[in-house]
């Protein structure tokens, strides 16, 4: 014959039972820990892409500073993309702008124009390398995908209509007189 426990005794026995305690703890703490882990990976990847873009643009600008006549917009993008190896489809996602500056107030103050992946258009920008001994200001923008779009820090990143994150780099140099 099966003995029935009084409900209060059954509850006391159930409350003292330790089986499954770690599963409940993991269900509470696990998502927070995983979100922190993926956010750290996301920010590391974004920083890597941003630093590679910045470095590639600076290296290309240094080359252009000495030999500006040999560079077109396509050559500039191609050279940047050869240095920025972590950017996928670099030539498709990169937009470059280059303009001579006469005085300090001529530096563009508007937002850097980026590729619109949703409309599949590249904005019109000028690419004028400048003459000898002229200050040249340039901007580059690459639109990259986030790794974890619906998780952690990626939720707070400023993304465009296609879900891409805009990475920008700015540079200035004086064209060498040849």
How would you describe each model-predicted region?
Residues 1-84:
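Alpha-helical assembly-interface signal, strongest on the long, hydrophobic N-terminal helix that forms
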Residues 2-3, 58-178:
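Short, conserved structural patches
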């Amino acid at each position: 014959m099966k003995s029935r426990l009084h409900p209060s005794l059954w509850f006391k026995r159930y409350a003292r039972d330790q089986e499954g305690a770690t599963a409940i703890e993991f269900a509470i703490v696990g998502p927070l820990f995983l979100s922190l882990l993926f956010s750290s990976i996301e920010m590391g990847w974004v920083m890597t892409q941003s630093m590679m873009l910045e470095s590639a643009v600076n290296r290309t600008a240094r080359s252009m500073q000495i030999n500006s006549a040999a560079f077109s917009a396509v050559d500039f993008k191609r050279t940047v993309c050869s240095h920025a190896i972590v950017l996928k489809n670099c030539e498709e996602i990169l937009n470059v702008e280059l303009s001579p500056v006469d005085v300090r107030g001529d530096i563009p103050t508007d937002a850097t124009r980026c590729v619109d992946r949703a409309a599949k258009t590249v904005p019109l920008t000028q690419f004028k390398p400048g003459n000898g001994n002229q200050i040249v200001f340039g901007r580059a923008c690459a639109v990259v995908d986030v790794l974890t779009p619906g998780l952690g820090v990626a939720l707070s990143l400023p993304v465009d209509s296609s879900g891409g994150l805009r990475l920008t780099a700015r540079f200035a140099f004086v064209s060498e007189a040849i």
